[in-house]
């Protein structure tokens, strides 16, 4: 039997039905957090199939080149911690709980979705870890995806693109 989700109490209150794409909520929340996303550059990877593999390879290449690199992917298999890789490995349960525990009022005020909340936590964790570059895997769409809130994305990669989410994305 799987262990209980150590983040359910912090993330479940923000779960909503349906897709709610947009950047305004997360941009406002990041401003309140002091814009942690401005403290590192990013590569954003979008697409239907293969973006997780491409993101992981780019992270490995940057790390091998001596760059302090972070990786943000979704979804996770077993733990929310799998989504955030710092230079020293996956973020731990306690550090992620600390980041999330400091955000409920902010998340309620800006009506963040769980994906936006965990993206904000990733940006804070990357900034605190001194990451120079983060590889950000798009969750859904690209243009209105939470990862697009990052202002310094000199490289945007595309994996193969399908029509599987056309009803949300047009």
Functional labels for PLM-detected ranges:
Residues 1-17:
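Charged, amphipathic alpha-helical linker segments immediately N-terminal to NTP-binding catalytic cores
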Residues 6, 18, 23-38, 64-154, ...:
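ATP-dependent carboxylate-amine ligase catalytic core
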Residues 12, 42-44, 107-108:
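A short, structure-level motif marking secondary-structure boundaries and short turns
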Residues 41-45, 53-70:
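A conserved segment at the C-terminal end of the G1
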């Amino acid at each position: 039997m799987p262990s209980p989700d150590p983040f359910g109490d912090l993330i479940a209150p923000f779960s909503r039905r349906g897709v709610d794409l947009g950047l305004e909520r997360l941009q406002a929340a990041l401003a309140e957090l002091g814009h942690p996303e401005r403290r590192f550059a990013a590569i954003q990877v979008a697409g239907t199939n293969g973006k997780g593999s491409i993101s992981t390879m780019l992270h490995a290449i940057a790390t091998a080149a001596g760059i302090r690199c972070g990786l943000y992917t979704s979804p996770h298999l077993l733990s929310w911690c799998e989504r955030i890789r710092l230079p020293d490995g996956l973020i731990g349960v306690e550090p992620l709980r600390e980041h999330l525990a400091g955000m409920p009022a902010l998340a309620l005020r800006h009506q963040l979705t769980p994906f936006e909340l965990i993206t904000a936590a990733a940006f804070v964790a990357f900034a605190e870890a001194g990451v120079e570059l983060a590889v950000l895997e798009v969750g859904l769409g690209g243009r209105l995806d939470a990862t697009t809130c990052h202002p310094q994305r000199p490289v945007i990669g595309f994996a193969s693109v399908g029509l599987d989410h056309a009803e949300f994305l047009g």
